[in-house]
A protein has these predicted regions:
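Extended, domain-scale alpha-helical bundle/helix-rich regions
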Residues: 241-277
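Structured aminoacyl-transfer and RNA-binding surfaces used for tRNA recognition/handling
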Residues: 1-220, 230-235
Length: 277
């Protein structure tokens, strides 16, 4: 029987008296990003407010649109859901460490390959780790977002990082785990393609195709879906097909004349996106 990872996470939170919320929108919680890139974005301003105390958890749909042209190469994420657990001056790192191990091993029945942590935290954090785990140091186990930062611990299963705990500001906890990655390790296979899911979520958030910001990302993803011949059915797809056809015709008529020009030139001068034609 396959494990329902999200249901198990909800059960895990309930058993540990941690309030749990299911977020459904990729709209960002501030104007620093086009879409919500992580589960902690809505809580980011609480880490430095020393009078705030408490613990909560969520699952947050996320969309990361860096390197759109590389989507599909197996290494660049697009749309995914992040399981998060956040504690503001309430849980200790040892508490958080015990909790995440319990979720991964007791609820999901996964076997931890190794645990990595920053060299500066070996002396302090190693006593939390059972001798049966392989421990490695990694200087990259340091998270930073502007002036907010923290050392972190990473957990690996089958050579894949499945979860991490950031000791944000030294007195807070930010735990994150990718839902789809955990589902794959638990034998759950989803049929929907990431580009299709991203398009669906952007439209659900009331964005429409346009030349800028969120609308441009939607337009770009629609174009990639058409290029990959993915089954897409929404009110914008025919309009996008027509736009791409016009670009293709213009490019064919002028490529000999301007063939050596860069992709940036074609886009800025004539609105032609070479990747789509």
């Amino acid at each position: 029987m396959k494990i329902n990872v999200l249901k198990e996470y909800e059960r895990f939170c309930e058993n540990n008296s941690i309030p749990f919320e299911v977020e459904t929108s990729i709209k960002p919680y501030n104007d620093s990003t086009l879409f919500c890139p992580s589960g902690m974005q809505q809580y980011a301003n609480l880490f430095e407010k020393k009078w705030i105390r408490g613990t909560c958890a969520n699952v947050q749909p996320c969309l990361r649109v860096n390197d759109l042209d590389k989507i599909g190469d197996g290494t660049h994420l697009l749309y995914f859901n992040m399981l998060g657990l956040f504690s503001f001056r309430e849980l200790t790192m040892k508490n958080a460490f015990d909790l995440i191990l319990s979720f991964l091993e007791d609820y999901l029945i996964l076997k931890i390959d190794k645990i990595t942590l920053h060299p500066d935290r070996v002396y302090e954090w190693t006593p939390y780790i059972n001798a049966r785990y392989k421990v490695e140091t990694d200087k990259d186990c340091l998270w930073t977002d502007g002036k907010t930062e923290g050392y972190c611990i990473e957990f690996y299963v089958d050579g894949i990082e499945v979860a991490n705990i950031v000791n944000t500001c030294g007195d807070c906890i930010d735990m994150g785990a990718g839902l789809e990655r955990l589902e794959k390790l638990c034998g759950v296979v989803k049929d929907i393609e990431p580009i299709q899911e991203a398009i669906k979520k952007i439209i659900e958030a009331d964005y429409t195709p346009s030349p800028t910001k969120q609308g441009y990302i939607l337009r770009k993803l629609l174009g990639l879906a058409i290029k990959k011949k993915l089954p897409i059915n929404n009110k914008f797809i025919e309009e996008e097909k027509s736009r791409i056809e016009k670009m293709q015709n213009f490019y064919k008529e002028n490529k000999d004349k301007f063939g050596k020009k860069s992709k940036e030139w074609w886009k800025e001068t004539h609105g032609v996106e070479i990747d789509l034609v």
